[in-house]
């Protein structure tokens, strides 16, 4: 896979003023492969299963605590 290059060039001359914009972006395959390796390591195999279980448990406790606090303040006796 070859790196993709994109460029934007804008130039305008009006009333003696000069505006110019020039942008260039290059996406490297090295960064993409690094991200892909990290995602494959964290999302597959035993480590991936452990990450999903830990994420599910953390999400459960966050929702549980938010529900508890909401119920406490909604049903609080005055």
Curated annotation (Swiss-Prot):
Family: Belongs to the SMIM1 family.
All ranges on the Extracellular side of the membrane: 68-78
Reported function: Regulator of red blood cell formation.
Keyword Disulfide bond listed: yes
Residue list for modification N-acetylmethionine: 1
Pfam families: DUF4731
Protein name, as recorded: Small integral membrane protein 1
Compositionally biased residues, Basic and acidic residues: 1-18
Subcellular location: Cell membrane
GO molecular function: protein homodimerization activity
Residue numbers on the Cytoplasmic membrane side: 1-46
